[in-house]
Amino acid sequence: MAYPEKVGNRVRWNYGKLREVLDLPNLIEVQRNSYEWFLQEGLREVFHDISPIQDFTGNLILEFLDYTLGEPKYSVEECKERDVTYAAPLRVKVRLINKETGEVKEQEVFMGDFPLMTSKGTFIINGAERVIVSQLVRSPGVYFADQIDPSGKRLFATTMIPNRGAWLEFETDVNDHIFVRIDRTRKIPATVLIRALGYGSNALIMELFENDKFVQETLTRDNTDTEEEALVEIYKRLRPGEPPTVESARSLLNTLFFDPKRYDLAHVGRYKLQKKLKHGILYRYPNGEEGPKEWDRLLNKEVPVDREFIRELTKEDIIATFRYLLNLMQGEGIVDDIDHLGNRRLRSVGELLQNQFRIGLSRMERVVRERMTIQDVDVITPQVLINIRPVVASIKEFFGSSQLSQFMDQTNPLAELTHKRRLSALGPGGLSRERAGFEVRDVHHSHYGRMCPIETPEGPNIGLIGSLSTYARINSFGFMEAPYRKVDKENKRVTDEIVYLTADEEEDHIIAQANAPLDENGYFVEERVNARRGHDTLLVPTDRVEYMDVSPKQVFSVATSLIPFLEHDDANRALMGANMQRQAVPLLRCQAPVVGTGIEHRAAKDSGVCIVAERGGEVVRVTATEVAVRTDEGRTDTYKLLKFTRSNQGTCINQKPIVNKGDRVEEGQILADGPATEQGELALGRNILVAFMTWEGNNYEDAILISEKAVKEDFFTSIHIEEYECDARDTKLGPEEITRDIPNVGEDILKDLDERGIIRVGAEVRPGDILVGKVTPKGETELTAEERLLRAIFGEKAREVRDTSLRVPHGEAGKIVDVKVFSRENGDELPPGVNHLVRCYIAQKRKISEGDKMAGRHGNKGVVARILPEEDMPFMADGTPVQIVLNPLGVPSRMNIGQVLETHLGWAAKTLGFNVATPVFNGASEESIWETLRRAELPEDGKTVLYDGRTGEPFDNRVTVGYIYMIKLHHLVDDKIHARSTGPYSLVTQQPLGGKAQFGGQRFGEMEVWALEAYGAAYTLQEILTVKSDDVVGRVKTYEAIVKGENVPEPGVPESFKVLIKELQSLGLDVKVLAEDEKEIEIKEIEEDITETAKELGIELPEERRVSSSKEEIEEEEEVEDNSDEFDETFLEEAEDDFSLDDED
């Protein structure tokens, strides 16, 4: 039965049957640990690799000794406000040695500002919060593969993949000859390479491979006889057209594979090589085999303490690989599965940064070498030699434009957390979504406990982007490890000792599931238990079990573990549920779920949106904006709260204290709630009284019927903040000016502007209202004598300016909540040419309305179709009206029964007045739900009689009623709905632009034209194809006719017709347009057309309608596809997909 358990500030009744042996790790340690490693060791490695730099004569030597990171100039909040990067200066100690004179110069050199990670695991780049996503790539090492030839013969291939350097591949053909490819060139007999390694004669080669028959066969194809010939043969293949010499050939082979500067296996590559080939070559021992020794886990023997990994290839590696291939041909050994997580590793922030830094340093190294030769040896200093530009540029480029550096998804705390735990197989050095096949995307047995099998985007990225499982961690080689409890095989007892295993270590062990029954001393209750080994699921005797799962939720990611009754949902729907929780909008009055999974507290705490006590103590002051704690050491810690700031996605970030003055707080306790958290628990939505029934077709096809009470009482009201900015620049005609004095604008429009011309905080604004008054100098015209006189008398004031004020865009409105002003005079850093910068923040309170998308946690999504008065909603026998009505037909075909169980348990828990936790795959059973319903004195089947709110009659059948957790998603109708009368036109075709962002028109496409043709609606059709689209003159005349109330004139020639003629003329065809009487009709250019028409009509055309030739429009028209952020940006999908709720029905 359930037992009470304190999570955060709240008690939940936990229905879990298994006790937790291991607490969840910190959920963003992936990011933090990796960056910490980079600062401590990663940077040092790069400097060590590149140091010393020698000039071509070997006389000057430049060494990098040590480095320090200074203090950042601004705090995180200031960086966001000022649009600067949160970074610290990197200073490196450099020594320059002149061998001839023996002179040594040491200097500290500034190497640029290095972006720092915030405590939340993010980076602030130019004021925007960004996340570096971890990348899943193939691990360096040696891989063996096989394929069946059309003749039915099994062929083998092996590839040696370095971290950087040339690939080496062996392959066999139908006649059992073995070939080698060096760096993707044409293949040559493998014995040529063996010969070039120093085994000159056939006899030596046969002896090396114990007279193997396949080697004998291959030798018949080999037309070299000595080591020198073999080297020359390889050189001819690699450098065709260059005169081969033995020396150049030998040095080429050495630089390709045996030079650590050119060939790098990295630690992980060397480890994988030794693991596969078991040839014992792992370390280089600087002083031979002497010196103090220690036990090494990788080699399982005593080795000297003073050792380092061998980074480059050795001859032994190549020969051992060749031997393994020969064994495979004999039928011994196993081929590798490249989708196994033992062969894929993670490159996290630290390593990605290290690689980028290495690129920058190697570019710098070239510059240093050049400067060493050019400059005078006596006056040279390290400072003069080093040019930091390439280093700074490569870091900037990585953070600013790498595919893996992404704008943080900040819709809600879960979205932030998931983004930091995301694993992407895309990006530089990874896969591309066009080339990725089905195998790479599929769930693999090695994902168990490492990568979530559920959470992945729908669409082209499915399976290429995943999420780290809750308990998984990443080891020093970049492999994911899952925790297991060790089983004492002697006593058949499960201990509490935790062992972390990588995917390939786990492969041969028998591992029991977390739900295997144990007694209180940790002994297995039953004789045989369910267990897995590799990809097999077995029923094994308990004495064979070696490990046991830590927890059922170790398989899933955080978002998936937040779904109660996950075990009763179909996987496809669970995927949607996990993904939609990330799109939940933080509500004004959010509630933690009545039916939770017990992980809500940890998710909220680790996401970084709450304020957590760093040290224990007593709360001495609580206000809306800060909390002060007097620590046990007597110091006072002050925590500043964020109030109504804008997130990356325009949702509202607001923190409010949940402790009182005089409270005792412990370290790690939550002091203040953030957005979408309540009492320190994640609270993405609301608990709402639901009935599963149809209602007059208003919830047909997943639509949702909701009570007006939800609108009145702000159940699903959220705050959205938009940012608008306006800058005053220097133009050729003089500086722009921010002012209240705007030409041709009345005082009533300026009523909310202050004396500077900037809107006041608290003003309510509507579309078209001025936010910042700004004037720009107009082009000078030839002045008449009188004007020159006036100019001379009154000075500059008579100059012509035009109004370029920042106005509220179409379709936006709200209250001004904040205004920030930056200017050159106050010493703010602004972009070149900008003198003033003003930012206005407009907040909107959005209640739930028809057209908003809502969802539960089980992938049950829908659109609000109707908001019904409370008195018309179906009500229960005691008069309580339900608050939301969902369609019961949405449940059976989709097989997400979890929502029904949640509804039952939610009703019982709400009635009894407590909250429950039902952890995934360890939750409440049907029996315990019935038991809880009985305790709450509710019907055991969770159904009750409902009465029609309009007639008071009971409905025919009893209806399932209960409490369900619903969330409002970031697909709001206010952001999608759009209409246009006149607006911008495309430059080439003169047709209206498309989309809400461009204030475009509705596309009347091919099929819509057919529809009108089918009805013979000729005039409607003509109007749509001419004046409403691209008949430039016609639309001006029509506009005028409508304004003056006259009849609309005949349409003219559409611009697209003129474009067609121009295209035909460009093919060299002489195209003329003839009237019925065979007279040629002259087709004018647009400008002539418009200006003539405008003259005839005597109207002054507004700027944009004359002909839009702004650069932005051209760019928008030729929509450039930009894949800089390759993560699942569901909120950027086109409106047409937004409401396709279900494809299957």
UniProtKB/Swiss-Prot annotation:
Q: Which Gene3D superfamilies match?
A: 2.40.50.100, 2.40.50.150, 3.90.1100.10, DNA-directed RNA polymerase, beta subunit, external 1 domain, DNA-directed RNA polymerase, subunit 2, domain 6, RNA polymerase alpha subunit dimerisation domain, RNA polymerase Rpb2, domain 2
**Which residue pairs form cystines in this protein?**
none
Which ranges are annotated Basic and acidic residues under compositional bias? 1101-1112
Matching entries from Pfam families are given as: RNA_pol_Rpb2_1, RNA_pol_Rpb2_2, RNA_pol_Rpb2_3, RNA_pol_Rpb2_45, RNA_pol_Rpb2_6, RNA_pol_Rpb2_7
The UniProt entry's GO biological process terms, in alphabetical order, are: DNA-templated transcription
**What sections of the sequence does the record tag as coiled-coil?**
none
Q: What class of enzyme is it?
A: transferase
Q: Report the GO molecular function annotations.
A: DNA binding; DNA-directed RNA polymerase activity; ribonucleoside binding
What's the catalysed reaction? RNA(n) + a ribonucleoside 5'-triphosphate = RNA(n+1) + diphosphate
InterPro entries of this UniProt entry? DNA-dir_RNA_pol_bsu_ext_1_sf, DNA-dir_RNA_pol_bsu_external_1, DNA-dir_RNA_pol_su2, DNA-dir_RNAP_su2_dom, DNA-dir_RNAP_su2_hyb_sf, RNA_pol_bsu_bac, RNA_pol_bsu_CS, RNA_pol_bsu_protrusion
Comp. bias regions, Acidic residues:
1113-1145
* Enzyme Commission identifier(s): 2.7.7.6
Q: Does the keyword Zinc apply?
A: no
Query: GO cellular component terms?
Result: DNA-directed RNA polymerase complex
Provide the residue span(s) of the region labelled Disordered. Answer: 1101-1145
Q: Which UniProt keywords apply?
A: DNA-directed RNA polymerase, Nucleotidyltransferase, Transcription, Transferase
Function noted in UniProt: DNA-dependent RNA polymerase catalyzes the transcription of DNA into RNA using the four ribonucleoside triphosphates as substrates.
The family line of this record is: Belongs to the RNA polymerase beta chain family.
Assembly, in brief, is:
The RNAP catalytic core consists of 2 alpha, 1 beta, 1 beta' and 1 omega subunit. When a sigma factor is associated with the core the holoenzyme is formed, which can initiate transcription.
Q: Specify the protein name.
A: DNA-directed RNA polymerase subunit beta
Lineage summary: Bacteria, Bacillati, Bacillota, Clostridia, Eubacteriales
